[in-house]
Amino acid sequence: MQHEPEDQTFQLQALEICEPDSSFDPQKPPESGEEYLMHMFYERKRCPAVVTKRSSKIRNNTGNTTLEMLDNPELPPFKCLLPTPEWRDEQVKSFQAARSQVLVLRKELANNNYDQSGEPPLTSDQEKWKEFCRNQQPLLSTLLHLTQNDLELLLEMLSKWLQDPNTTVDLLHDVWLARWLYATLVCLHLPLEPHVFSTLRYIARTCIHLRNQLKEDEVQRAAPYNLLLTLTVQVFAQNDFKDYI
């Protein structure tokens, strides 16, 4: 049997996304789902086939803390800050396309003896993780080192940073946090455990609270919150949040 070219097997996706051309800048952070997919194409060719066995878990400093439960948020004060149905559909398509790429890549790496339990990029120290996430893009060469358990714990850390009491979070300016949240959700294995849904719901409530603080004309600042809320409802089926989108 004749094997398909390697590049062709990686085209299984929900959207038609072009591979990076000569104008592609890998140092420029992605600003949309489509650009994130292009970065995935680029990163795919740089992922190692085999990595070493990890020596420790991330859980050490994260498993002993719990998320602060937020009250049920109020409905948005300005309807103009809500996403349109067309916008929501486009974001879901881009997200599902990214997930499809991750699934294909994981299968290919498994066929090449890729060890997903490889050493994580940092220690179990949450502050070092935060520093790393602030200064590095969420590349596949990093995220594919993490097991499902590690991804869940990373999502929990991100959700805590989203409601940091010592800073004023604005996902339009704190782009690093928005990108890591999106990329971690892309890489999560399904189905999810109940405690992961609890983390997702915490993130959704926080996004609603932050969006409710915006003024009527701050539509652009609402976009990152709308994206995470849309994914929570339309991808992860937390339908009781649908009134907020």
UniProtKB/Swiss-Prot annotation:
Segments passing through the bilayer: none
GO cellular component, one term: SMN complex
Keywords attached to this entry: Cytoplasm, mRNA processing, mRNA splicing, Spliceosome
InterPro entries the record matches: GEMIN2, Gemin2/Brr1
Protein origin, superkingdom: Eukaryota
Knockout-associated phenotype: RNAi-mediated knockdown is late larval to adult lethal; the phenotype is the same if knockdown is restricted to muscle tissue. Conditional RNAi-mediated knockdown in adult muscle tissue results in age-dependent decline of motor functions, including climbing ability and flight.
UniProt note on tissues of expression: Expressed in nurse cells and oocytes.
Assembly and binders: Component of the core survival motor neuron (SMN) complex composed of Smn, Gem2, Gem3, rig/Gem5 and one of 3 almost identical Gem4 paralogs encoded by Glos/Gem4a, Gem4b or Gem4c. Part of a minimal SMN complex composed of Smn and Gem2 only; this complex is active in UsnRNP assembly. The SMN complex associates with the entire set of spliceosomal snRNP Sm proteins, SmB, SmD1, SmD2, SmD3, SmE, SmF and SmG, and with the snRNP-specific proteins snRNP-U1-70K, U2A, snf/U1A and U5-116KD.
PANTHER family in the cross-refs: GEM-ASSOCIATED PROTEIN 2, GEMIN2
UniProt function note: Component of the survival motor neuron (SMN) complex that catalyzes the assembly of small nuclear ribonucleoproteins (snRNPs), the building blocks of the spliceosome, and thereby plays an important role in the splicing of cellular pre-mRNAs. Most spliceosomal snRNPs contain a common set of Sm proteins SNRPB, SNRPD1, SNRPD2, SNRPD3, SNRPE, SNRPF and SNRPG that assemble in a heptameric protein ring on the Sm site of the small nuclear RNA to form the core snRNP (Sm core).
Family the entry assigns: Belongs to the gemin-2 family.
The protein's name in its UniProt record: Gem-associated protein 2
Native source organism of the sequence: Drosophila melanogaster
Gene name linked to the record: Gem2
